[in-house]
């Protein structure tokens, strides 16, 4: 699916036969040129960086938080769509309503978040846990519905480590922040 999406993007953007994209905070490199679509993984990996035990503990903390909020969301009529915690190699994305949520569902969550401060509260909770455990992680609000958790320094600009001499465009629904 990712390769098909890249081909569609190449056609839409109009860069012809030379297009490079760095999803996953720059730890994955997909490019399209005369030889076709190719994919390389940069040798950085969050699970290896943290260690299996700490990584598993983080996943357990997120799973417990998801279980807590799922009941509240269900009682309040908020959407739950599936694919709540996604490991992307360089980061974990936690989306309490689910990555599969579509427009109206996302809008409903954003309204709830604006009214209740849901993400601010859970951002604080996760940051307190990270500080208590003394783990070098950054917890950031990811777009309008999720949280991005990654090793400190591995934000979207991390790709500049590998491609600092190139023009890089950063995309996402909250890049203005």
Residue ranges and their predicted role:
Residues 11-15, 161, 168, 175-177:
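Catalytic phosphate/metal-binding cores of nucleic-acid and nucleotide-processing enzymes, i.e., regions
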Residues 28, 155, 174:
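Gly/Ser/Thr-rich beta-alpha loop segments that engage phosphate groups in nucleotides
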Residues 1-83:
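Active-site phosphate-binding/coordination module
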């Amino acid at each position: 699916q990712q390769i098909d999406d890249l081909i569609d993007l190449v056609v839409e953007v109009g860069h012809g036969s030379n297009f490079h994209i760095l999803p996953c905070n720059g730890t994955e490199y997909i490019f399209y040129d005369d030889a076709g679509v190719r994919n390389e993984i940069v040798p950085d990996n969050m699970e290896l960086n943290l260690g299996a035990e700490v990584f598993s503990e983080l996943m357990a903390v997120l799973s417990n938080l998801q279980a807590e909020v799922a009941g509240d969301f269900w009682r309040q009529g908020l959407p739950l769509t599936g694919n709540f915690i996604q490991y992307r190699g360089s980061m974990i994305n936690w989306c309490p309503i689910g990555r599969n949520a579509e427009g109206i569902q996302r809008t409903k969550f954003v309204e709830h978040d604006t009214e209740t401060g849901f993400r601010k509260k859970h951002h604080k909770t996760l940051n307190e846990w990270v500080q208590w455990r003394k783990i070098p992680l950054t917890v950031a609000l990811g777009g309008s519905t999720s949280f991005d958790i990654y090793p400190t320094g591995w934000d979207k600009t991390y790709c500049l480590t590998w491609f600092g001499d190139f023009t890089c465009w950063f995309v996402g629904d909250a890049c203005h922040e």
